[in-house]
């Protein structure tokens, strides 16, 4: 999600970013962000996206995950993307700009879906990180909880949910909540995640089964 971008004055981050293997690979492959390779690795292991599926991507900008999802669902599928930041159009992707914590963008997304059952909800949302864990962790968990609430509204039985989480307070309870609603919950830490990052991804499969 765009809100997590670092300040331009972070020289170290800029140097690391431009020399980063996954950034370079994304540029070569035509992906908008290194995050595309996180989803591709999870896809390789878990085969969560298939042709013809309906996918919702929360925290989508700049669109790396949308590119991967649109390629995999093909012409018979559909991808719906939401982010607080503007995002350039992508073929096969319906883009909505807005803050997911507010009601109006959520309603716009639900209206765009037109009641169609969703096969997969993706969430790469993260707050602006202050570097103060006691501040950042509750904000991150709040976004993960909102994404789960949304998934519970739109997923069809047997649907899947993939969300970014950060290790810290509230994560164990959140995982237990997933286990109550889904038949299987798996933790993934893609190689394209930065080594020093506390982020990982929870893949919850089999909604309501």
From Swiss-Prot:
Gene Ontology cellular component annotations, sorted alphabetically: cytoplasm
The positions flagged as active site in the entry are 164
The molecular function terms of the Gene Ontology recorded here are:
rRNA (uridine-2'-O-)-methyltransferase activity
What InterPro entries does this protein map onto? Answer: RNA_methyltr_RlmE (IPR050082), RNA_MeTrfase_FtsJ_dom (IPR002877), rRNA-MeTfrase_E (IPR015507), SAM-dependent_MTases_sf (IPR029063)
- Which Pfam families does the entry mention? FtsJ (PF01728)
Q: Which reaction does it catalyse?
A: uridine(2552) in 23S rRNA + S-adenosyl-L-methionine = 2'-O-methyluridine(2552) in 23S rRNA + S-adenosyl-L-homocysteine + H(+)
Q: Where does S-adenosyl-L-methionine bind?
A: 63, 65, 83, 99, 124
Enzyme Commission no: 2.1.1.166
Specify whether Acetylation is a keyword of the entry.
no
Keywords, sorted A to Z = Cytoplasm, Methyltransferase, rRNA processing, S-adenosyl-L-methionine, Transferase
Where in the cell does this protein reside?
Answer: Cytoplasm
Similarity remark: Belongs to the class I-like SAM-binding methyltransferase superfamily. RNA methyltransferase RlmE family.
Q: Which HAMAP family match?
A: RNA_methyltr_E (MF_01547)
**Function (record text):** Specifically methylates the uridine in position 2552 of 23S rRNA at the 2'-O position of the ribose in the fully assembled 50S ribosomal subunit.
Listed name of the protein? Ribosomal RNA large subunit methyltransferase E
